[in-house]
Design a protein with these regions (language model features):
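Short glycine/proline-enriched loop/turn "hinge" motifs that connect secondary-structure elements
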Residues: 513-520, 591-595, 746-753
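Short, conserved catalytic or adaptor-binding loops enriched in Gly and charged residues
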Residues: 475-481, 557-558, 592-595, 748-751
């Protein structure tokens, strides 16, 4: 917990020691200060500075206190716009200088050429609104000449110049990582003080902002100490296979930094949010580099690395006080599980301790060798599993383990272990060369549907608030009491939270149902939500669809043509964290909750049977159980500008997400005649999506406005990085941008899923009316897929055969299904 000086205190010390003390009676004083503080505090500072100058006998010529964050934008709005308000302005032209980019370069990344333009965002909307001008009256141009980074020219309706001015931000360069200085250099805007007395410059130097001081400490002290610790714990080689390196790196911050909303959609000014994102993403980058360095540069960079839980915990603005930084690093209690027993004998007063390391047992995959039925009894009387061992060495240990499980169950513990629905007893048979050991257990499966406090009575899912994982569980299991919904806990997350699955289909009387038949008789729609758990709207519209299909006859009718499987929250650990963080800063993006509790993306662990992220195994199990015809994975992204101050301003690994571009999705095709059914489906889905999403007038108007803003600020200047494809007033990416395309392999021709879709909604973090709006966008997308499946064309083939006195009957549904929309394969 370091003692960090407040930037304003640093200013006062320098000003009073080096400027105020030099002011003689009648001296003319000018001062410009740049600090990273809220506008109200900066105005108070200016008043106080003037007062102290006058008390010293000086004459104030000019005192200006500007923002050290987004310096160009706030110079325009606070210094230029008030002057223009009193003039007959017809047009405003804003010039900006390109940010220098070196090609070729040894740096891992650089700033964007339009970086200085980006720092003006959203100046055109703000200026037009403040001056009462049409939006197209404010224009930008790239300027190569002149010393200043920015220029502004205001003209009247005749073209006469009313105002011309220029401005440059103050900035410095630093390494992206102190520990790896060759990785990249970044340019960071900063604070400054310039003071003149009687035209003599007394001070013209940097005043480090609070965020500068915080970041310097975090890089030079925290990350260096953490790096030393994990090297010590890994024998000097913190390679990827030795991760996770730690349990939690928590960075709690209270600071006097600007954090306020702009009157443009969900845009805001927030140094605090930027610090959250730098702490989170830059730290993950740091550990990627740690692993790569340990591997001699051969480690692939991947989001699958699980360094540990990086947790920025940022409090709301604490105006007018020094920053309070508390950093907590915690490792794991033990490198591997241990059983420690401390005991003493009755006759002995001294305690003794025994420690045993618990190594995992290497158990081969069991096979079913026994399925016993009895006349007049439902289900299986016994279900037997055979474990075949190569030698006898592990047999006693496994037998003891099974005996201990029996003893625990006799005491009422772990009663659901080895519980399988539809079987009365479970038999476990261990076979080794020359030895056999068998145990029998009562099968006590967990209830598939949790008992809610009350049955479903009225609408549960509303779109006026963020749904927490706990609320999602209540909703899911309450809906599970209805006839056509089966809700069960598919597994548990790394931190022990339930991951529930909802299966929605027409009611069935039988307790045992063939999964093969469910996959065959009707198409399957599979939907997952909150993979990136701070993208909050997906759970809301997914659960609402589930509720309607469970309770509304109109929506229930769709179940005649499809089965639906839903995972409302596949990343409950991240969702729980982001839910708690939004209580502090409700509209921040809260990316610390994006990935899992250990850092990697959950789906990246689906095919890793040894993963620590057990929530990924639920996704794996559901995808194996339900062979989906359509898969949907709705996502989200920031609802406002996304800034990384210490990574050259724009989000380093997510450049195209810098500002909102409205709701969007993709329906891509590969020009290959062998993939006609898949391409036809994508073309049909494009129409269904446009119809369902943009039929809401407010959704359509909002998206078109933000699409236009995105084009003005990004595509015009850097089309290689930013693009949009608008189809029927909806952003749906369809065309290839690359000049080449990979040739699809054989697996592309046999995949059963005809359409896999993802979306991006402006929902990090949406609240209130904005959450309702973006959730309506997502619900329209779900309904597009429901309509597609409802109208799809598919066939069922019944085949019968007789052989050696037995009759075989099979039912087959060829895949992929085909679009039922006439002419879908001929759309342009």
């Amino acid at each position: 917990k370091p003692e960090l000086e407040w930037e304003v205190d640093a200013f006062w010390k320098k000003f009073r020691e080096e400027v105020l003390s030099e002011i003689a009676s009648g001296a003319k004083v000018s001062m410009e200060l740049r600090v990273s503080e809220a506008p109200e505090l900066r105005r108070e500072l200016a008043i106080q500075v003037k007062s102290e100058i006058e008390a010293q006998g000086g004459q104030v010529e000019e005192v200006t206190v500007l923002s050290a964050y987004k310096q160009g934008l706030l110079w325009l709005m606070e210094q230029v716009a008030p002057v223009l308000e009193n003039l007959p302005v017809a047009t405003v032209e804003l010039g900006w200088k390109p940010f220098p980019v070196e090609i070729p370069t040894d740096q891992r990344f650089q700033g964007e050429p339009a970086r200085w333009l980006n720092e003006l965002y959203p100046a055109d909307d703000l200026l037009a609104g403040q001056l009462g001008l049409p939006l197209n009256s404010v224009s930008f141009f790239m300027q190569e000449e002149g010393e200043s980074i920015y220029s502004v020219t205001a003209k009247d309706s005749s073209g006469a110049v009313l105002l011309q001015d220029s401005f440059s931000p103050k900035y410095y360069e630093r390494p992206y990582f102190d520990a790896f200085p060759d990785y990249a250099q970044v340019t960071v805007t900063t604070g400054w003080l310039k003071a003149t007395v009687d035209e003599v410059t007394l001070v013209d130097e940097r005043i480090a902002t609070d965020s500068d001081r915080i970041w310097d400490y975090y890089q030079a002290t925290t990350l260096e100490e953490v790096y030393d610790e994990i090297k010590s714990n890994t024998g000097g080689k913190p390679t990827r296979d030795k991760a996770p390196y730690f349990h939690t790196l928590r960075v709690e911050l209270k600071a006097s930094e600007p954090d306020y909303k702009l009157e443009i959609d969900q845009e805001h000014i927030s140094v605090l949010e930027s610090l959250h994102d730098d702490i989170y993403f830059d730290t993950l980058d740091f550990f990627y580099e740690v692993a790569e360095t340990a591997a001699g540069g051969d480690a692939p960079r991947s989001r699958s690395l699980a360094p540990g839980n990086v947790l920025p915990w940022i409090h709301p603005e604490r105006r007018g006080q020094p920053p309070e930084l508390t950093i907590t690093y915690s490792g794991f209690a033990s490198k591997q599980p241990k059983l420690v027993v401390r005991y003493r004998e009755k006759e002995n007063e001294e305690y003794e301790t025994e420690t045993r390391v618990l190594a995992p047992a290497e158990i081969p995959e069991p096979y079913i060798y026994l399925a016993e039925v009895k006349a007049g009894e439902d289900g299986l009387a016994r279900l037997g599993f055979l474990v075949t061992l190569e030698d006898t060495e592990p047999l006693p240990r496994l037998a003891t383990l099974l005996d201990n499980l029996q003893r625990l169950q006799d005491e009422g513990l772990f009663t659901e272990a080895l519980g399988i629905r539809g079987a009365a007893q479970i038999v476990v048979r261990l076979e080794a060369p020359g030895a056999v050991s068998t145990r029998t257990y009562a099968s006590q499966p967990a209830e598939r549907s949790a008992a809610p406090s009350e049955l479903y009575r009225s609408r549960l899912v509303t779109w006026d608030h963020v749904i927490s994982p706990a609320e999602s569980e209540i909703i899911s299991h309450t809906l599970g009491t209805l006839p056509n919904v089966t809700t069960y806990v598919g597994g548990y997350s790394y931190q022990g939270r339930p991951v529930s699955v909802m299966e929605i289909k027409l009611p069935m009387e039988a307790e045992l149902v063939s999964q093969a038949k469910l996959n065959t008789w009707k198409p399957v729609l599979s939907i997952v939500g909150r993979q990136h758990a701070n993208e909050v709207s997906s759970t809301s519209h997914i659960l609402r669809l589930a509720e309607l299909m469970a309770t509304d006859p109109q929506y229930q009718s769709y179940l005649k043509r499809m089965n639906v499987v839903i995972q409302p929250v596949v990343n409950p650990d991240g969702a729980s964290l982001s839910y708690e963080l939004q209580k502090l800063t409700p509209t921040h993006c809260l990316h610390a909750g994006r990935y899992s509790a250990l850092g990697p993306d959950v789906p990246g662990q689906v095919n890793n049977p040894d993963t620590l992220l057990t929530e990924a195994l639920v996704m794996r199990d559901v995808s194996r159980k339900w062979v989906a015809d359509v898969r949907l994975n709705p996502h989200g992204y920031p609802s406002h500008e996304w800034v990384h101050q210490f990574a050259n301003y724009n989000p380093k690994s997510f450049r195209s997400y810098w500002i909102p571009r409205g709701w969007y999705t993709s329906a891509r095709v590969i020009e290959d005649p062998r993939l006609k059914d898949y391409n036809d489906a994508a073309l049909a889905m494009r129409d269904y999506i446009a119809e369902e999403v943009s039929k809401d007038p407010q959704v359509r108007e909002t998206n078109l406005r933000i699409y236009d803003r995105y084009q003005r600020w990004t595509m015009r200047w850097q089309p290689h990085l930013y693009n949009l494809e608008i189809y029927r007033d909806t952003a749906i990416y369809h065309s290839r941008r690359s000049s080449s395309v990979s040739v699809p392999g054989p697996e592309a021709l046999i995949r059963p899923t005809v359409f896999s879709g993802s979306t991006e909604a402006m929902d990090e973090t949406a609240q209130g009316p904005w959450l309702d709006l973006v959730t309506r966008m997502g619900f329209g997308y779900l309904m597009a897929s429901v309509r597609f499946l409802d109208e799809a064309v598919y066939s069922l083939y019944r085949m019968e055969g007789e052989s050696q006195g037995s009759v075989r009957i099979s039912l087959t549904r060829p895949r992929p299904i085909r679009s039922g929309r006439p002419g879908s394969g001929n759309q342009q």
